[in-house]
Amino acid sequence: MALGDLMVSRLSQSSVTVVTNHLYDDDDNCASSAHDDSRVSIIASPRVASSSYENLSAATSMAYLPQTLVLCDLRHDDASDIVQPPRWRLKERMKTGCVALVMCLHITVDPPDVIKISPCARLECWIDPFSMFPPRRALEAIGQNLSIQYERWLARARYKVELDPTKDDVRKLCLSCRKYAKTERVLFHYNGHGVPKPTPNGEIWVYNKNFTQYIPLPVSELDSWLKTPTIYVFDCSAARVILNAFAEGESSGPPKDCILLAACDVHETLPQSVEFPADVFTSCLTTPINIALKWFCRRSLLKEFIDESLIDRIPGRQNDRKTLLGELNWIFTAVTDTIAWNVLPRELFQRLFRQDLLVASLFRNFLLAERIMRSGNCTPISHPMLPPTHQHHMWDAWDMAAEICLSQLPQFFLDPNTEFQPSSFFTEQLTAFEVWLDHGSEHKKPPEQLPIVLQVLLSQCHRYRALVLLGRFLDMGPWAVDLALSVGIYPCVVKLLQTTTIELRQILVFIWTKILALDKSCQVDLVKDRGHIYFIRFLDSSDAFPEQRAMAAFILAVIVDGYKRGQESCLEANLIAVCLGHLEATQLCDPPPEPLFLQWLCLCLGKLWEDYLEAQIMGREANASENLIAGHTNLLQVRAAAVFALGTLLDVGFDSGKGVCDEEFDDDENIVEDIIIKSLLDVVSDGSPLVRTEVAVALARFAFGHKQHLKSVADSYWKPQNSLRTSLPSMAKFHDSGTSIVASSDMGSLTRASPDSQPVAREGRISSSLQEPFSGLMQGSPLADDSSLHSDVGIIHDGVSNGVVHQPRPLDNAIYSQSVLAMFTLAKDPSPRIASLGRRVLSVIGIEQIVAKPSKSNGRPGEAASASHTPLAGLVRSSSWFDMHTGHLPLTFRTPPVSPPQTSYLTGLRRVCSLELRPHLLGSPDSGLADPILGVSGSERSLLPQSTIYNWSCGHFSKPLLGGADANEEIAAQREEKKKFSLEHIAKCQHSSISGLSNIPIANWDTKFETGTKTALLHPFSPIVVAADENERIRVWNYEEATLLNGFDNNDFPDKGISNLCLVNELDDSLLLVASCNVPTLSRASFAIRIWKDYATKGRQKLVTGFSSIQGQKPGASGLNAVVDWQQQSGYLYVSGESLSIMVWDLDKEQLVKSMPFESGCSVTALSASQVHGSQLAAGFADGSVRLYDVRTPDFLVCATRPHQRVEKVVGLSFQPGLDPAKIVSASQAGDIQFLDLRRPKETYLTIDAHRGSLTALGVHRHAPIIASGSAKQLIKVFSLKGEQLGIIKYHTSFMGQQIGPVSCLAFHPYQMLLAAGAAGSFVSLYTHHNTQLPR
């Protein structure tokens, strides 16, 4: 497809006319153009298009201001909230095992300190003690009734009643209760209505045997008999005195688990009003619904219509929510729980309302007692002390529910068939909760209805709505999950996994996802209750959406994460087959499956067989590796998860206590392991740090199991020169073997195995030899020549001599060589974390690295500091494999080389800079680690680096999943403000009349760069200029305030070399892209891309991502002229240099998506990506040619021409301002600037002879008709697009008019008439226009 055809849809709405690219009818000319070395080579070109614009429409603004955003996912946000450890779990659950009821009533005899009114309260446990004769009968009935009232709250406890006891009776009762309860709680209930009030010392009263005396009982004795844990209920006057006595006892000793409930304060007596029962406190604690309704009825307008006796006959059962009595109890529980939740500290709420069922019931009822008894001038007291709750507004909701209930009572008894009408209480409270969800947040008061939501979950009628609302709440963040778990939803959602209701499955999976994202310890409960079966069935269901099945896979991954019982249970439930079945099915899906689902299938498998040999064997037998390799997609999360699963499929060695010969691995398993390592090596240079991290972790596992032989392979390169000559290929041989272009993504092309090469056995395993060695894998390998056989024999003998006795298990030498090369590649990774991991992997096989301090550069790129003198200085390794592939990587071998070189041999031999290999003796103090050839040990295994993909992926489910649009409103508003600013200034730039730039800079910045400014850029929306020097020092300067905002080093490697700076996502929180080209070593250079956030804030810069961008280079490439440009509209980064292609990186996918080859012996020296036409790119070459590419066309190349007369490299290249897709400005080092219309490329339509040679920089304004060129002869010239010279800049504004240095870089502000110029000196100058006249 031609260029014009591809651009029609994009530009059809603008004033630019675009037609198909058929300028020539001469097919021969067109056909031969691609290989023509003449001045002009054309593939296609459209007719001339108009480039006049009257205004910027909304459509054209889309081209000028692309909406594409990259690198803004969770993986790039290191500033995620630190999740605090969950606090919801109780330290321990308690149970009340025994209840002691002590009744001191002595009916018919009033205590001496009580003066009763008439009439007065008489009922005890709703029985009139004077209604029976003899009094003992009434006493027994009251005791029995109290026991029954308590049994409604806790039926399984043991109840013991003592009626009018003596002190010895109480002692025996207490001792027997403690003996029975053991470590469980004991409840001691004391009714002292028939004895005097407690003494000031806190003594309660009992009787002597003849009831002739009151005997004091100190609470200290009571406490010594009952011990702890206990709960006391004192229903007597002045009961707080007893609490004070307990408090004094606790203050003198360690704190005890002791809870006390007292009926009234120190100077208060129990109410005697006839509207209350005599034991009003006990009635509130044990029969709350009855007394609450009677108390409310007397204060309600319904009292004239309701017979109070009907309350005693309310139909239904207390534990049946579908009856009137059951619903009232349900509402009462919800109300009191809500009051407690909203007024108590969380820890106290959990202790009193969630730790013990009986204690929770008593404290709910205690809140009612406070409300009712305060109306009788009594204040119930508790320990721990509770704040006042009698006026809480939730009591109004209870009163309303009670009133609705009472209003129905007469009809129930008039017509027994009357249908029960449920209360609207829960519906209304759920609506209130929903309103909070619409407007609440973490920073507002928590929803008070949360305990009510828990209560609703217990019943089917509102369960679905409650679960949906609960899911919305949990989605607000980990704080919400912790809050919900603290209120007590956990047992309920565990129990709901036993339901088979289909409509609840999806929301339950969502809720469990949120719970496990906060607290993985729930895995134990899920396995114990067989909850994993529920989620495996859901995962295997066909009616669930992929996103929901991804959540199920996440839940199962958490269940098996580090929990052996979970792994065993899921393996028994056939989880491997379920996951692999989905992976197989997704390979045939069109459209592609949900990436999150694929990601968590891989992570679930990886966690299932991590350090679990039985699962690893089953995974290998099921060909899991093939499915995982096929799962490598364009999405980096899936790639990283697949690499993680492949890595954990590798067995790292034996568990402690297992012998060397416990297990055998057959040839098929060897082949699987071989396939896994090859697939890992294929992605060792992946564009995503997340993927490369997993590769490093997986290689560490592989190295741990094969460290003896990996170390031997590395040692083979540490031989004296006479050994190297026989075991290493020459440099010429290496380059002649077809490896002149090194493709790191295909590690197989790096080395070659001889057909006769001997396989090396894996450490610690016994297996038969592989009869057919792998071939075609190692090209240029040090073991690939005729001496490879001898080298292998030496390796095997070395293994035996070091005490590892085993029969050889075949593993191709190529794998070991490629793996060691991959480890060195990772140790030089642009990401500091991955480089550190790479060094740790090397340490596993016995190689330590010495961090070399970079020496001060003298300003001449390519010079490296000489290494410090060592005993091995001068060893010849010019043809060493390390030199060819590792670059300047300081190393140390932690074990001696195979053949230590002699001192005489080392004299006078050449050294390789920055690379130090130092032999360490076994067990030497500075070796740092145990020798890797020793047996597998826990201490060594603990050194293996840990994966990050799993924990990082779990963070996804901690974030809001159901919405989040509101959170982006502020970002959208800022973007719109920037967009408006941009469009206004674009219009000004396009329609301005520019007379030139002032020779006097508006700002002069001394960067203090020792090597001069290499590149600079101007921030589009802030008065900021960013500059960098050859040593990759980056500095950010505010030119309005003349202040340095930040300065940092791009990397810590000794080899430096900056190439370019670009801004990514400039309409949002922009990122700084830094392209650096390190000094090469013999065969390859490192061209690294690093992208920084918060680069303008001092000390806050953070590396978002980093990768090596050039995947292949020419033989002998210096790598110093690598070029890069960024295209926001497509999200593509274009990179080239001394290679045979232009690399196209998708930054959002962090993946190399295309490689555009060019048939030329010249290197690319300039790149310019169109900022208004996505996927379009112009490239300038070292021979002066210019080519136009479009990544959407099959052949990429659209047009090629050679506009410059002299064969000099293209220094600068840019598309002209505006929407025209074919007009380009090209500047040659010879000094001429050519204006091209690539639709008519036979000749340039305008030429400017700007400089007589030595043109060094070109700047083209993105929107204004102005360009600037710089020269090594210390001047800058400014031109219009018509070729008119608008000005010359020669001098800095300073005393004596100091001349500027040789110009190294020029950068225009994208939306203002502002030019930044950097020179070989340390100054960066900013120039603006004389005046701008807008058209009227």
UniProtKB/Swiss-Prot annotation:
Disruption phenotype: No visible phenotype under normal growth condition. Residues 746-766 are annotated as: Disordered. GO terms for cellular component: Cul4-RING E3 ubiquitin ligase complex; TORC1 complex. This is Regulatory-associated protein of TOR 2. Keywords: Repeat, WD repeat. Disulfide bonds: none annotated. Pfam families: Raptor_N. Probable component of the plant TOR kinase pathway. Belongs to the WD repeat RAPTOR family. PANTHER family: REGULATORY-ASSOCIATED PROTEIN OF MTOR. The keyword Methyltransferase does not apply. WD repeats lie at residues 1008-1047, 1053-1102, 1116-1155, 1159-1199, 1205-1246, 1250-1289, 1298-1336. SUPFAM superfamilies: ARM repeat, WD40 repeat-like. GO terms for biological process: maintenance of shoot apical meristem identity; TOR signaling. It comes from Arabidopsis thaliana (Mouse-ear cress). Residues 746-757 have a biased composition (Polar residues). Expressed at low levels in roots, leaves, flowers and seeds.
